[in-house]
Amino acid sequence: MTLQEQIMKALHVQPVIDLKAEIRKRVDFLKDYVKKTGAKGFVLGISGGQDSTLAGRLAQLAVEEIRNEGGNATFIAVRLPYKVQKDEDDAQLALQFIQADQSVAFDIASTVDAFSNQYENLLDESLTDFNKGNVKARIRMVTQYAIGGQKGLLVIGTDHAAEAVTGFFTKFGDGGADLLPLTGLTKRQGRALLQELGADERLYLKMPTADLLDEKPGQADETELGITYDQLDDYLEGKTVPADVAEKIEKRYTVSEHKRQVPASMFDDWWK
């Protein structure tokens, strides 16, 4: 088995999917897991990007079905901007599409800035823009877990195969969640599911960005990665990509393995 095939298997990628069946099994997963845990529903941060829009809509479909079947579940969508978000209109469009039971907004700027200032005062150095970006992601995680803890809700994560293969998420930030309904999907498959669900094309054709950096606001994921999502998707779907691209992907996969594992102990083999 080639490394490409091993990665496809490890990340549960299916090169060809049936859109309706894929939506059905992911909604069922959300329903089954929330029932199994005894939680009261879900909470998820909504950025206006493809991934949170898709996960949010699946979550809302799941809680509506649970209620229609006589159960009780709710979904809270959370806006978590740092000051004014450049693409706030897209975030509002996503909320209109998702139709969450409840939407709340929590500006993380005061929390992030207070921490950054305290860090600088105590350690006599400023956080790099990259590390401050990770603080933003982790404050968003803390906020979602605070809401989840208060309301008895599970935190949904938006990680999918094209992010997982590169480790393109913040450890214990957007990587911190209770369940991952998008696991195994490539970026183009996620787009196709949103299209099948009737989302405005603006929500799945827009340029993907983590938007964590003050110095490079709205920087494209592809710029930061040095790899396009089409190249990642082709690789994950078993297609041939240029050798240098495959090498980049496989190197990122190897060095980011710690992000896909629980914290290492002396009894684990994965890090050796």
From Swiss-Prot:
The keyword Nucleotide-binding applies. One of its GO terms (molecular function) is NAD+ synthase activity. Mg(2+) binds at residues 51, 163. ATP binds at residues 45-52, 158, 187, 209. Its EC number is 6.3.1.5. Deamido-NAD(+) binds at residues 138, 171, 178, 258-259. One of its GO terms (biological process) is NAD biosynthetic process. It is an enzyme of class 6 (ligase). It catalyses: deamido-NAD(+) + NH4(+) + ATP = AMP + diphosphate + NAD(+) + H(+). Pathway: Cofactor biosynthesis; NAD(+) biosynthesis; NAD(+) from deamido-NAD(+) (ammonia route): step 1/1. CDD domains: NAD_synthase. One of its GO terms (cellular component) is cytoplasm. It holds the Pfam family NAD_synthase. It comes from the Bacteria. Keywords: ATP-binding, Ligase, Magnesium, Metal-binding, NAD, Nucleotide-binding. Belongs to the NAD synthetase family. Homodimer. Catalyzes the ATP-dependent amidation of deamido-NAD to form NAD. Uses ammonia as a nitrogen source. This is NH(3)-dependent NAD(+) synthetase.
